[in-house]
């Protein structure tokens, strides 16, 4: 049962009795004012529980949203590229990706770097090294991060190198070292392409281009006032036109 009307009637009776002046004109004005004021006050108090309830519900919704487990916006994706395929044959994809990572990633400030030079160390006619390209590679197990962009989306890819031994059966069983590249990144679950497939294709293209750029060059050397100078005589690019 709604007690609002009973409360309003009781308060109106008490206020009219309290402020009665026995002057009909003044009492009439006071009655109108008191009734209007009490109606407004009682209405506000009757609406108060619903107002408080609405505020409480909104606060609780905010609290539940804040403390509920966050759904992951992105998922972790990992791929493994081994130097030996499943049938124990050389994996050319590994060669391309390894070339890209060791050629195009800056190792200048890395704390763990392996250095090697596998060619014969020789001097040229100017007493300078013929080949100054020292191989610099990451130490196995050391993680490194680089950014890869595809379709205007940038991915932060973490990678590291590792090895294991696999058994190869020919005329007899032999253990062979298998080199591994681990690649990991975070992707949007709604992504419409395979980021690692696109990345490895890019590595293959760049690796193939690097092989094409290694042109055969024939040089002639001329002694000019005691100093030898070299001139490119023939490259493989114009061999056909040269002998045509």
From Swiss-Prot:
Protein localization: Membrane
Record's keyword terms, sorted: Glycoprotein, Membrane, Transmembrane, Transmembrane helix
UniProt main location, coarse: membrane
Membrane topology reported for the UniProt record: Single-pass membrane protein
Cellular component GO terms, alphabetical: membrane
Residues bearing attached sugar chains per UniProt: 137, 147, 152
Transmembrane segments: 26-42
Name used for this protein in its record: Uncharacterized protein L573
């Amino acid at each position: 049962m709604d007690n609002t009307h009973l409360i309003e009637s009781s308060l109106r009776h008490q206020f009219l009795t309290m402020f009665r002046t026995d002057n009909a004109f003044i009492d009439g004005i006071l009655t109108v004012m008191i009734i209007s004021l009490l109606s407004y006050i009682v209405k506000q108090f009757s609406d108060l529980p619903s107002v408080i309830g609405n505020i409480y519900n909104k606060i609780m919704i905010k609290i539940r949203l804040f403390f509920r487990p966050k759904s992951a916006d992105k998922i972790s994706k990992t791929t493994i590229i081994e130097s030996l395929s499943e049938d124990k044959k050389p994996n050319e994809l590994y060669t391309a990706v390894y070339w890209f990572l060791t050629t195009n990633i800056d190792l200048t400030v890395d704390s763990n770097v392996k250095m090697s030079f596998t060619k014969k160390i020789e001097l040229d006619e100017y007493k300078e090294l013929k080949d100054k390209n020292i191989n610099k590679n990451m130490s196995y197990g050391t993680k490194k991060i680089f950014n890869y962009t595809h379709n205007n989306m940038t991915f932060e890819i973490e990678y590291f190198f590792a090895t294991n031994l696999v058994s190869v059966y020919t005329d007899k069983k032999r253990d062979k070292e298998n080199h591994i590249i681990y690649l990991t990144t975070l992707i949007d679950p709604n992504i419409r392409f395979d980021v690692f497939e696109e990345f490895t294709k890019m590595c293959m293209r760049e690796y193939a281009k690097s092989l094409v750029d290694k042109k055969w060059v024939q040089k002639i050397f001329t002694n000019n006032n005691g100093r030898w100078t070299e001139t490119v005589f023939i490259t493989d690019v114009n061999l056909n036109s040269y002998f045509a």
